[in-house]
C-alpha cells in the first residue's frame, strides 16, 4: 500500500522509498507472533521454526536445523520437534511461534494478542517466556493485548490506544495510579 499521508519510518528511513533489498533486510530484523499461532499444519514443529531461516538466510541446512533446535530448546520444546502442530497443545503452539519469531535474532518483536485462547496458567507461562527472551536477547518488543494482567506483568512502557488514537502512555506505576 502507498500511504495517502504521513510516512512509515523504519530506523529513520522511509519505508516507501526503500529498495526491495532494504525491505528484505528490514524483514530479517523483525519477529512476529500472531494471535493464532499461524503454524503450517503440513510442517513439523522443527520445520515451522526453520521457515524464516529458509526464507531469509544463507545458512546451510545443518546450521538452519541447529539454530531452530536452539530456539526450540529455549522454549522447552526440543522433544516436540518432529511433531506436527495438530499434535500439540495451544500453549505449545504459541511457544513454537515464539521460537520461530526469534530464530533470526530480530531487533524487534511484534506480538498480536500472544495469550489469545490460552488458559490463565498457560498465559502466565507465555508472558514469562516473552519477558525473559526479550531481556536475554535485548529485543524491543511491542505487544498488542487486551489482557491487563499480561500488561502489568511484562509491560515496561504502556500505551493505551482507543479507536486508533493514543489516549495515554506511561510505566506500570503511572498506569496503576491513573485516576481516569
Which residues does each PLM region occupy?
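Conserved ABC transporter NBD signature motif
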Residues: 6-14
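Helix N-cap at the start of a conserved alpha-helix in ABC-type nucleotide-binding domains
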Residues: 120-122
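Catalytic Walker B motif of ABC-type/P-loop ATPase nucleotide-binding domains
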Residues: 109-112
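A short, proline-enriched helix->beta-strand linker immediately N-terminal to the Walker B motif
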Residues: 103-107
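Conserved ABC ATPase signature
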Residues: 84-88, 92
